[in-house]
Amino acid sequence: RNLHPFPTRRSSDLEYAKHERVMRELVPTLISLAAEAKAAYLGFTIDAEEAERLDLMLDVFEALSAAPELQNWNGLGLAVQAYQKRALPTLGWLTELGRAHKRRIPVRLVKGAYWDTEIKRAQEGGVTDYPVFTRKAGTDVSYIACARAMFAGGDAIYPQFATHNAHTLAVIETLAASRTDFEFQRLHGMGEALYDVFHDLRKPAARGIGTRVYAPVGSHEDLLAYLVRRLLENGANTSFVNRLADEEAPIDDIVADPVATLSSLTPRRNPRLLLPHDMLPDRKNSQGFFWSDPAAAAPALAEMKRSLASSQLAIASGAENARGVKSVLDPSDRRRKVGEVVEATPEHAKVALQSAHRAAHDWDALGGDARATILERAADLYERDRAHLMALAVREAGKTLPTALGEVREAADFLRYYAKRARAEFQNAEQLPGPTGEDNKISLHGRGVFACIAPWNFPLAIFTGQVAGALAAGNAVLAKPAEQTPLIAAAGVKLLHEAGVPEDVLHFLPGDGPAIGNALLSDARLAGVAFTGSTEAANAINRALAARDGPIAALIAETGGQNAMIVDSTALPEQVARDVLASAFDSAGQRCSA
């Protein structure tokens, strides 16, 4: 008999960012459970689970293998998913581990049960490529290659083949030749007819080859997700079990050789699953990576550290010769100085408004296509300097590492989105219907000068979104960052200037909100305001704009960022707990977006 616990059912904190805690808290628990299994002559197999957890689970398994309590025991095993592109290297690592610890490791080879999740997470994460094969034939070929590697593992690997596929059964038998030191596995309630026929025809038990039946054990809440995954797996159009039940499916197709199938496909990857960076139909997706991937995370952390080796400086437009500087402190440790800012005065704001007003016409006349090219170039520069921007998000704004990465990605997405809108709506005039003899067209143009006032909780993303939207529409911009986060905003403005936005079109005005606001809002040359913050402040801006003489100014306001969470009886408690923690510690629960 064999126990197969899922560590994630015990701890939702099973993530690489909490590596030290996992090794300190989870490993002793698993060692204790495995020791009990050893004493009861039971096997004990843990799961590598999703791709994001693979490196962490391999570290956990290595610690279990080295535990003194579990020595001289060949019952400690690991389940490996063949649909992961790292399955073969994982088996090679396990083989070396088994030899190093002089143990035979039971390896349960499965095809994988989280394919949809792996694809979706890779798309959301904007990673370079998918961690799993995108065609079923690719997974089937990988399974065969992994089986061959397991047989080649000698005394370091005890192969356990979990499958409900007749072709896979036949391949395993062929690869095994005369070997009998392995076993087949199936799930309770699945593959019974297949294995009945297999046992009648091939009589594996008589040759000493066992077939283990896996049965789920647990509460209804724990088993529900498992059962749903099994239904999705067996209900998939490409599933062997599902196709076998289809009387119209040709038998030759059902038992086709996956190697031949994959070789006949061009391209080998699924063309309907574009790479995460290319998945959007009309623009590039922002680039990201998984913090659970040490190969990506370690260089990013090192570059973040290097980028803040020297103090940062933000200078308001026109204040280059000003003397007064203000320190910017780390919100998580007020003793730590991140940099300095030279703030704008009301006089600086008025000079900037005059300069922007003169430059607005030429910027608008540039056309939507040219402005879009500049914004797209800026998005590329944001991604080039991603580590520096992330470091500022962490040190200046108090962001966690995942939210810092999300901050930069969202800013890049804003730039590319508004570039797309600029091309679509501001490049060419649109022909309108009209009476015979009339030629009616409509073209969109910038209003003039926009003030963009951003919040502290998304100091780069919302700041960039406001500025990019106004620039894309042909407006000159006076960019006012939150008083708490001028450094990251200054870095964004610097990259926009580097991308080609003229300095007299985009002005940077950090400083006291009411003082700068009073200098700008009463001036009729200000055509509009984009504001994210409190409802009270938005109402004050609205009243100030309405009270002045001159053209009516536009106000785009996003307000009221203190959210309530409503939880009903159908919610999963562990999901609620994760969401509550995220809400409490990301922006202290104050977000203007769900």
Q: Residue locations for each model-derived region?
A:
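Terminal low-complexity tails and localization/encapsulation signals of metabolic enzymes
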Residues: A205-R207, V217-G218, D222-Q354, R358-H361, ...
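A structured beta-alpha segment of the ubiquitous adenosine-cofactor-binding alpha/beta core
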Residues: D439-K441, H507-A527
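Single conserved hydrophobic/aromatic residue that forms the stacking wall/gate
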Residues: R1-T8
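ALDH superfamily catalytic-core signature
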Residues: E498-G500, S522-A524, G528, T535-A594
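Conserved small-residue-rich beta-alpha loop and adjacent elements
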Residues: N428-E503, E574
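Short beta->alpha connector loops at strand-helix junctions that form conserved
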Residues: K480-A482, P510, D568-S569
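Positively charged, amphipathic and often flexible ligand-engagement surfaces
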Residues: R9-R283
